[in-house]
C-alpha cells in the first residue's frame, strides 16, 4: 500500500533509489518470484488456496449440527438464531484481520502473516494481469467453496460421529497442515527477499547499514498504520461510487452464501421433513454452482486475454471494463434469478430438486460476481487496489457476519417465497452497476482522483 493519506492526491512522491544490494541483479534474477519456475509458483498458489479452503469451511461447519449443539448448551433458536453466533464471530474477525495482517505481509514478508491471509501472494508471483487471472479465480473459488462446503462436512460428521468431532477434526487438519506450510511455503515478497539476501551477503562492516535499512523498511507509526489500513479504505468506500456499489454487490454475493446455511435448514426441514444433517447436504448444490461459475470465469479470463493482445482493437484505457462482461449474466441470472427461482419453487407440492437448482444458480452468480469485482478493483485502482479491496473485503465479511442473523426472521415472517425475493430485488438493483461501468467506466475513472492514473497506459 502507498504512503498517501486518503485525503491526499493519489500522486506518489518520488522515492529515492534503493541501494544496489536491494535491487535485483537483472530482469532474469532467479530469486525474483516473477522468475521462479511455473511449478514452484503454482505450488505456492495451490498451498494458498488449500489454506483458504480449510480456513473457510471452519467458519460454517458448525452450521451442520447447530440444533444439536444448541440443545446441548441450552441455547434456543426459537426467536433468534443464537446458534449462528460462532459463525458471526468468525466472519467479524475475518473483516478485521486483513487490516492487521496485510501490513505484516507487506513489511515483514509473507511467512509471518501467512496463516491469516493469502490473497496478497498472487500479486507477488505473477507480474501481469493476464497471468494473474487464473490464480485469482482459483483463490476466489477456494474461498467460496470452503465456506459453502462447511455445513456439508458438519452434517456428515454429526450423522456418523459426534458433534464435537466437528472441532476435533479441524484441530487435526490444522496441526497436520502447519508443518507442511512451514516447510513448503517460501517467501514471495520481493523487498523482503532482497533484504535477506543483502544481509546474507554483507560483510561485517556492511551489516550495520543493512540493519538500518531493515529498520526503516519495517517502521511504521500507529498513525500511519491507521491512515493506510483503516482511514483510506473507509474514505474510498464513502467517496468512490465504484467502491461503494461494488462492495455492496460483492458483499451481498458473499452474504447470500452464509444466508443459505440458515435458510436451507428452514426450507427443507419444514417443507420436506428432512433431518438437520440431511438438509446440510443441500449446500453441495451451491458448491456445484461455484464450480460452474469457475468455468465461466475461465472464459472471462480468455476474453480479457484476447482484449489484452497488442493486435486487439479494444482500447487499452477500456481494459478494466472487460473484466465485467460475464458479471452481467452472473448477477442478473445467477444471483437475482437464482434467488427468485429458489424462493418461488419452495413449495411442498414441488420436487425438492427445483429449489436446489435455484441454489446452484446463486452459486454460479456469487463466483462470477466476486471474481469480476476483485479483478476490476485490482486493475482500475492500480496502486490503490489494496485499499479498494480492503473495503470490499470488510463489506463481504460484515454482510456474512450479520445478514444471516436476519434470515430466520425473514423466512418465518415473510415466508420462503418473499424472503428470497427481497434479497433477489436487492441483487437485481445492484446488477446494473457493471452495466454502467461497461458503458461509462472510462469517464468515471477520469473523474476519480484514485483511478485517474489508469492501470494500463
Predicted regions and their residues:
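C-terminal transmembrane bundle
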Residues: 56, 88-91, 95, 154-155, ...
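Pair of pore-lining "gating" transmembrane helices in MFS-fold secondary transporters
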Residues: 38-60, 238-259, 332, 340, ...
Amino acid at each position: 500500500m502507498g504512503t498517501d493519506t486518503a485525503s491526499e492526491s493519489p500522486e506518489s512522491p518520488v522515492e529515492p533509489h534503493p541501494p544496489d544490494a536491494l535491487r535485483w541483479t537483472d530482469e532474469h534474477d532467479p530469486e525474483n518470484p516473477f522468475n521462479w519456475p511455473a511449478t514452484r509458483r503454482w505450488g505456492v498458489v495451490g498451498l494458498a488456496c488449500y489454506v483458504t479452503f480449510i480456513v473457510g469451511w471452519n467458519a460454517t461447519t458448525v452450521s451442520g449440527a447447530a440444533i444439536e449443539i444448541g440443545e446441548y448448551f441450552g441455547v434456543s433458536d426459537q426467536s433468534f438464531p443464537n446458534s449462528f453466533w460462532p459463525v458471526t464471530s468468525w466472519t467479524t474477525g475475518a473483516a478485521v484481520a486483513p487490516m492487521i495482517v496485510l501490513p505484516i505481509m507487506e513489511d515483514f514478508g509473507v511467512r509471518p502473516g501467512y496463516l491469516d491471509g493469502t490473497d496478497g501472494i498472487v500479486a507477488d508471483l505473477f507480474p501481469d494481469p493476464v497471468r494473474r487471472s487464473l490464480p485469482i479465480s482459483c483463490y476466489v473459488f477456494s474461498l467460496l467453496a470452503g465456506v459453502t462446503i462447511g455445513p456439508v462436512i458438519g452434517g456428515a460428521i454429526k450423522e456418523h460421529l459426534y458433534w464435537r468431532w466437528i472441532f476435533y477434526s479441524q484441530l487435526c487438519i490444522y496441526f497436520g497442515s502447519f508443518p507442511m506450510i512451514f516447510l513448503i511455503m517460501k517467501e514471495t515478497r520481493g523487498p523482503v527477499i532482497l533484504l535477506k539476501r543483502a544481509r546474507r551477503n554483507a560483510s561485517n562492516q556492511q551489516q550495520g547499514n543493512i540493519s538500518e535499512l531493515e529498520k526503516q523498511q519495517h517502521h511504521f507509526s500507529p498513525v500511519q498504520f491507521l491512515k493506510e489500513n483503516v482511514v483510506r479504505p473507509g474514505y474510498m468506500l464513502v467517496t468512490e461510487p465504484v467502491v461503494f456499489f461494488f462492495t455492496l454487490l460483492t458483499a451481498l454475493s458473499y452474504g447470500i452464501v452464509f444466508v443459505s446455511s440458515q435458510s436451507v435448514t428452514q426450507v427443507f426441514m419444514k417443507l420436506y421433513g428432512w433431518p438437520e444433517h440431511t438438509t446440510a447436504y443441500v449446500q453441495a448444490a451451491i458448491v456445484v454452482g461455484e464450480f460452474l461459475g469457475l468455468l465461466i470465469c475461465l472464459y472471462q479470463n480468455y476474453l480479457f486475454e484476447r482484449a489484452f493482445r497488442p493486435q486487439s482493437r479494444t482500447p487499452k484505457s477500456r481494459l478494466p471494463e472487460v473484466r465485467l462482461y460475464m458479471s452481467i449474466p452472473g448477477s442478473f441470472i445467477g444471483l437475482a434469478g437464482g434467488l427468485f427461482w429458489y424462493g418461488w419453487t419452495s413449495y411442498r407440492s414441488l420436487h425438492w430438486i427445483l429449489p436446489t437448482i435455484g441454489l446452484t444458480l446463486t452459486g454460479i452468480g456469487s463466483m462470477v460476481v466476486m471474481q469480476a469485482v476483485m479483478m476490476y478493483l485490482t486493475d482500475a485502482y492500480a496502486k490503490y487496489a489494496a485499499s479498494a479491496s480492503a473495503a470490499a473485503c470488510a463489506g463481504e465479511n460484515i454482510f456474512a457476519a450479520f445478514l444471516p442473523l436476519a434470515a430466520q426472521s425473514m423466512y418465518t415472517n415473510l415466508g420462503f417465497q418473499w424472503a428470497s425475493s427481497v434479497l433477489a430485488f436487492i441483487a437485481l438493483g445492484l446488477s446494473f452497476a457493471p452495466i454502467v461501468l461497461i458503458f461509462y467506466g472510462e469517464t468515471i475513472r477520469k473523474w476519480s482522483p484514485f483511478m485517474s492514473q489508469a492501470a494500463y497506459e
